[in-house]
């Protein structure tokens, strides 16, 4: 027999918030038990309602702020307490960045007491209208006769009913009502689980994931919507390989973005991985290359290179750049971008960097500089090879401070010093910590 969930108290309870959890919730301790409370900041006195009561901890949501923290601000989005896309809109952006710096510092200290010789100034940009890619759920609710379009609600799998999204670029974030009207008017509305939007510097693409073939009427409705806005229109009847554009039928098949500091332009397919914060990306790439201190006679290795976000700009500074990425499609995109920018001093290789690389020709060469931009799991296997690859300077771009700290400890043990580190606010209003670190080979005495 399934255990019945304990009935939750209806009356709000008081709580004193002591600190913040890793996912942005306030932490209170009541009668020896920890309670995680949404929409609450350290130092605040709040009234909250329980959302879950468990044996070891409870969860709740603040319904009244009795004593507010000086760090509290009015959220820029009306849906901030419902939508799970953001977790820190009620905290000032400056304090958000300070908190991310503290998380990076704590993680480095936790793994072997690491401390960089220099803390880099945080890289910051716009805190609204910054996100250029999004995947949104679509749900037709027959009982209510309505269609939902949005992100998941906080702490559950329901789709939040949104009108706007203030972190998406305005051309997308202020059209969610229009997208919902479009989806609701389709004959196939119950067979469309999600839509995806991606923007380049000048164009927006809308991708419709559909489980059944679309009728001619539905296709015409989608075409009319996209043509009216000048958006590219894509359909996805199956897995990612089935994505295809139905409008415009002629012309450029890619979106693109520019790196003005390098004078280059990178093309991408809407489903390709790209950094979602264009402004921070435009600052991050030249920062990383400046920290690498590349000379025209240098050979540079770019690991986890993707479509060439760092590789292509680096080729404008270096004698030769080698990029390695697991996806053959991304390798082809890298070469496409090299041709697009009339660069011939590059080569790309497809290989899973979590696997043995000893049989790879590129791994038997030596390099002057190495850039690493791994996934959340880090790059421990590649880090162990750094002495053999020979670079005197390494720049490591990380989306997970815990694996950065782990890999930093390994690099220190292999004879590198942690020259500098800092955070980049790639995802304002979230707890996600993007960071960058510089390692230099220690000179033998």
From Swiss-Prot:
Residue span(s) of domain TRAM: 5-64
Disordered: annotated segments: 1-21
Recorded catalytic activity of this chain's protein: uridine(1939) in 23S rRNA + S-adenosyl-L-methionine = 5-methyluridine(1939) in 23S rRNA + S-adenosyl-L-homocysteine + H(+)
GO biological process: rRNA base methylation
Keyword Magnesium in record: no
CDD domains membership: AdoMet_MTases (cd02440)
PROSITE patterns from the UniProt entry: SAM_MT_RNA_M5U, TRAM, TRMA_1, TRMA_2
Domain of life assignment: Bacteria
GO molecular-function term, one example from the UniProt record: RNA binding
Keywords annotated in UniProt: 4Fe-4S, Iron, Iron-sulfur, Metal-binding, Methyltransferase, rRNA processing, S-adenosyl-L-methionine, Transferase
Annotated active site: 399
EC numbers on record: 2.1.1.190
Binding site for [4Fe-4S] cluster: 77, 83, 86, 165
Function: Catalyzes the formation of 5-methyl-uridine at position 1939 (m5U1939) in 23S rRNA.
UniProt protein name: 23S rRNA (uracil(1939)-C(5))-methyltransferase RlmD
Native source species: Alcanivorax borkumensis (strain ATCC 700651 / DSM 11573 / NCIMB 13689 / SK2)
